[in-house]
From Swiss-Prot:
Cellular component, GO annotation: cytosol
One biological process term in Gene Ontology: 'de novo' NAD biosynthetic process from L-aspartate
GO molecular function, one term: metal ion binding
Originating gene: nadA
Keyword Plastid: no
The protein's name: Quinolinate synthase
Family: Belongs to the quinolinate synthase family. Type 1 subfamily.
Species of the source: Salmonella newport (strain SL254)
InterPro entries per UniProt: NadA, NadA_sf, Quinolinate_synth_A_type1
Residues that, per the record, bind iminosuccinate: 47, 68, 139-141, 156, 226-228, 243
């Protein structure tokens, strides 16, 4: 008898923490990376959740700091022949899908994502096959194989609008892999949404009791929440949105103090946007519980200066992203659908 894969029961081993560098070592690797970027005709694209020193280096070298989709779009438009992707593996895959002619390097190919790991292609395909009447919508935080199985790829920034659109056409939805984001979208739209039961290990750890206590300490603070968080956290929020939307909310909200319920890597760009405001981390544990991620993705933390330098210098199988041609073709279709839909929203 086959056993159904249960994303909620899955335990993902965390990678070891990178060895800290002293100031001299940091400066050595920063200069080495700058030199290698020029030698390789490369540009660095970094996610909001990488460490501040990585984001700063991307800025200094003419690169990009953004969400996963904008990272890939920036890379596709840039003249560089090589992209150094500081993030997790699905981000490198997305960049390769959109820029197959470019050399896509990563500091390490072992940088995973719990949402990606929690949606293995064989089990997900069987799930989709069991519901053939539903349109398959998958989050960007998935493998190339899962994207190729989908009808649409979506980011959190346009998830509500896309599901509203599909619902208006009378379509029923399979949503994967994040159950919290799927539930949020369903409540916002009223659509018929069947959710795969994955979750982000960082956002899944935010706790209402601990957050309530923090709100009592800072009663005038606004709460900014990423919709990958549990429903109980989302319901407490003053603003809910994607990484880029939360940064915009930080600027528009009048509050001088902001409690932020997402990966603390976002604080680098958010603090730049609102230097006059105080940013507070939402708690990820409480009532005797201990956090595992402590509001920072352990795989994002693998993108250290030494690893980036090694990726640029060595390349090869340990650092270069490859996507099977057939998978790329299959994944490109739902990605392009999303890009075209997003363009209509901006028009």
């Amino acid at each position: 008898m086959s056993v159904m894969f249960d994303p909620q029961a899955a335990i993902y081993p965390f990678p070891p923490k990178p060895t800290p560098l002293n100031d001299d070592e940091k400066q050595f690797y920063r200069e080495k990376i700058k030199r290698l970027l020029k030698e390789r005709n490369a540009v660095m694209v970094a996610h909001y959740y990488t460490d501040p020193e990585i984001q700063q280096l991307a800025e200094e070298t003419g690169g990009c700091i953004s969400d996963s989709l904008e990272m890939a779009r920036f890379g596709a438009k840039h003249a560089a022949s090589t992209l150094l992707v500081a993030g997790v593996r699905f981000m490198g895959e997305t960049a390769k899908i959109l820029s197959p002619e470019k050399n896509i390097l990563m500091p390490t190919l072992a940088a995973e994502c719990s949402l990606d790991l929690g949606c293995p292609i064989d089990e997900f395909s069987a799930f989709c096959d069991a519901h053939p009447d539903r349109t398959v919508v998958v989050y960007a935080n998935t493998s190339a194989a899962v994207k190729a199985r989908a009808d649409w790829v979506v980011t959190s920034s346009i998830a509500v609008e896309l599901i509203e659109h599909l619902d208006s056409l009378g379509e029923k939805i399979i949503w994967a892999p994040d159950r919290h984001l799927g539930n949020y979208v369903q409540k916002q739209t009223g659509a018929d949404v069947l959710c795969w039961q994955g979750a982000c290990i960082v956002h899944d750890e935010f706790k209402t009791q601990a957050l309530t206590r923090l709100k009592k300490i800072y009663p005038d603070a606004a709460l900014l929440v990423h919709p990958e968080s549990p429903q109980s956290i989302v319901e407490m929020a003053d603003a809910v949105g994607s990484t880029s939307q939360l940064i915009k909310a930080a600027k528009t909200l009048p509050h001088r103090q902001l409690i932020v319920a997402t990966d603390r890597g976002i604080f680098y760009k958010m603090q730049q946007a609102v230097p006059e405001k105080e940013l507070l981390e939402a708690p990820t544990a409480g009532e005797g519980a201990t956090c595992r991620s402590c509001a920072h993705c352990p795989w994002m933390a693998m993108n250290g200066l030494k690893a980036i330098a090694e990726g640029l210098e060595q390349g090869g199988a340990a650092h270069e992203i490859q996507v099977d041609a057939a998978l790329r073709e299959g994944a490109l279709l739902p990605l392009n659908r999303m890009l075209d839909f997003a363009a209509t929203l901006r028009a």
